[in-house]
Amino acid sequence: MRADCFPSSDSPGPTVLAGEVLRRLRRPPIAGGPQALTDFFDRLLQARRRVLMLDYDGTLAPFEHDRMRAQPYQGTRELLLRIHTQPGTRLVVVSGRPAREAADLLALAPRPETWGVHGWERLTPSGQLVRAILPQQAKVAMTRVLALKPQLEGAGARVEQKYASIAIHTRGLSAQQAAQVRALIAEFDPPADGPPRPEGIYLQSFDGGFELRALGPNKGSVVRGVLREEPRETLIAYLGDDVTDEDAFAALGGRGLAVRVLPPAGAETPPRRSIAHVALRAPEELLQFLQRWADLPFGAVPPP
């Protein structure tokens, strides 16, 4: 694979992108709701190139205490396969998991393009895995995090080492246990008047824990890379549930629809602000969206 297929060197770092997201949050809310979906699907039917990008955990599959049991919602695979095989449509999965792990859990054949570790890994449909180069500073910082593994696991957390990050899972822990875990990794997110943060890595919360991530690619840089590879008129939708997906929403610009996927009724998470155009409740509204896309007669679009 060509080096320029990997959006790493020219992608803004998380500090810059976070500022971009905050600026967008201060603007008037983006018009959304049912009409936004209607307008999008009207445009989608006329588009000659389409890209559907989706997160995995919390979007295509519910969260599970045992992460390897997180299977897609019933009916999701069949709809994604129909979309994946549509003419002029590109299906892309973007996950915080390792790319092969996400692809294996989704278990689509033929396999779609899959990005893992928030954009550090790219798994092509042919099975080729490409990774961005991990800076030495990040490697050193991750070693410091791994030195805390016995204490973190002693507090009840589950520590997962990935290529460019270390996830610390706290799902199912009490508030006291979660606070103890957070205190153990406080040095990686010091206050403004505290000691300097270790170079090459930063701390980000997610739904179910914390992640120490190397500075570099993120889901927003994946979107920008896909946009560069596609014709200008390509229409894109990105579906995601977590704060890490806000980077992707921001990167869409005016080229597509940002969809926040909400958890099933009864599995609510703390409210937070989002720059998504619309929100869909999993699994019912998610499946309706995929069904609507899968049912469009793209083969009927006349040639220019």
Regions found by a protein language model. Give the residues of each.
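The start of beta-strands in P-loop NTPase/AAA+ ATPase cores
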Residues: 50-52, 112, 236
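Mg2+-dependent phosphoryl-transfer enzymes with acidic/Ser/Thr/Gly-rich catalytic loops
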Residues: 4-9, 14-34, 47, 220-304
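Conserved acidic, metal-coordinating active-site core of Asp-based
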Residues: 160-239, 243-252, 256
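Asp-based phosphoryl-transfer active-site loop
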Residues: 45-66, 93, 223
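Short loop/turn segments at strand-loop or loop-helix junctions that form parts
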Residues: 54-59, 118-119, 163, 169-171, ...
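Active-site phosphate-binding/coordination module
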Residues: 71-161
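Short amphipathic alpha-helices and their capping/turn segments at secondary-structure boundaries
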Residues: 31-48, 101-108
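Short acidic, glycine/proline-rich loop/turn micro-motifs
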Residues: 63-66, 125-129, 271-273
